[in-house]
Amino acid sequence: MKKIMFLGGAAHQVPALQYAKSQGYYTILCDYLEDNMGKFFADKFYCVSTRDREAILTIAEQVCIDGIIAYASDSALETAAYVSEKMSLSSYTPEVVSILSNKNLFREFLKNNGFNYPKSKSFTSVRDAVRGLSGFKFPLIVKPADSAGSRGIASIDHISELGPVFEKALSESAKKIVIVEEFIETTTDFMVGGDIIIINGKIEYFGMLNGHRDVKKNRCIPVGNSYPTFLDDEKSRQVQLEIQKVIDILSIRNGAMNIDVIFGKNDQPYIIEINARNGANMVSMLLKKATNVDLVGLSVEMALNNAPNAINQTVSDTCYATYYLRSYEKGVLERINFNSRITENIINMQMYKSSGDEIEPFDGLDKIIGILLFKFENQEELKYKMAHMNHYIQVQLVGQLQTRDGESSLCPLQVM
């Protein structure tokens, strides 16, 4: 029986554990939280930080694992790469993970290899940043060099706004490095995102998605994804060529990746991020519905050095989307009101909060209340409803006044 170690047992990581169990693999889970959901699906659980690579290596060697995976987790990627290298397992190299996981190193990589990139600079103190940003054009994006889930990311329009934004970003960085870069004005309505699968050094699967943003509240943080891509064929081809170029330079053979790309005013693609793991927040579920490819299963199999020779995918005429339930105010969740014109589109739902739970203002993906998976008849319906979701869904906190009539209970959710 093959043994596979999972780094992280959060709710969004459970599907990978479930897949491994369904295939008869022995599953070992490591997580620093004792009350994680994943331990109920694992054969063996160790309460240990996934950032403690020596402790993880010791356990991995004792158990004699055949593979290790940090499914949809940035924080444990470097540990997985370290253990894999020490035990000659199938994974990305530590060098590749370091470049892709640290935004300052990735910007240098892009610059040194002829890619498009925004003007940027890294700092360890706000004092140095104020001095070092002369010549930069506003607006600027300020973000931790090594955080995940869009934590600590914000835009500023004037240097006077830098102080608190910089300190917030610094607090979210494990390495205490903040990167500041010029905002890329885009020619498209959406970012380009999605997951890819690499086999024998080539992209064999490209699940390209539209990345939705709430530009009125925080243009830096995603609020959902949709399929199919709104890009034309030429722009889609450009994105794939740019990502393949990164794969070639880094000599990547096999693996799953999550990407973010923007087209600038010059109509050229700018790679914002490439993450050396699957996308979180129901990306794999969305793409499985849309393309009939099990990205979760593929990632587990590749961690065990069982990469397939080819991937068979279908092209769906149906439109799918995810949407992140959130509140921009702090409070206690009372209920969520849904208009009947949107409930007809919901095909799956993952809730992370319940009525009575404390809710923090949405400033990163760790503050998501829940995620909805939608099915739409066509792109027109998808675009309209995703752009006007506040007309269909309302997160109501205790003490807030209702603004819609005609509700019927779905407790703790409620239909308008």
List each language-model region with its residue ranges.
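Glycine-rich active-site loop/lid that clamps phosphate-bearing ligands
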Residues: L325-S355
